[in-house]
Amino acid sequence: MINFKRADHIHICVPPERLEEARQFYTEVVGLKPTHRPEVFRHPGFWFEIGDIGFHIGIEPGLVNTSRHSAFEVKNLEEARETLESKGVKTYEEEKLADRERFFFLDPFGNRMELLEYEHD
């Protein structure tokens, strides 16, 4: 048995020539806080914090769009949606789930993201 403690980080990829654009999108549009990235890696990238989880951006040529995605719980879903849409990010909804509200968006590099807020009794 594997005794998991928590998720440590999420890693997404962007085309190499758009890495700086990714840094700007995730700091200026999404509002993530950059954190230290060790200099031991051979490939460029950036690290950010989302709560107590790391969010890492690396490079990969020839990306394809899929249904893979990362999901993040937020405190105020509608405020998050308004923040993104006010900065030109298109949001969309998919199937409704019984215990949570959610929406999706694509970053400028085709990475699919879900933001969600659980319904409280």
Descriptions of predicted regions:
Residues V40-P44, V64-T66, L97-E101:
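Short acidic/glycine-enriched loop/turn segments that link adjacent beta-strands
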Residues M1-R23, R68-S70, D121:
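N-terminal beta-strand motif that seeds the catalytic metal site of vicinal oxygen chelate
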Residues M1-K5, E85-D121:
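Vicinal oxygen chelate
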Residues T66-L84:
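Mid-chain, well-packed structural core segment of small domains
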Residues G45, G54, A71, R102-F103:
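Short hydrophobic/aromatic beta-strand element in the GNAT-like acyltransferase core
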Residues I12-G54:
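Core segments of cupin and vicinal oxygen chelate
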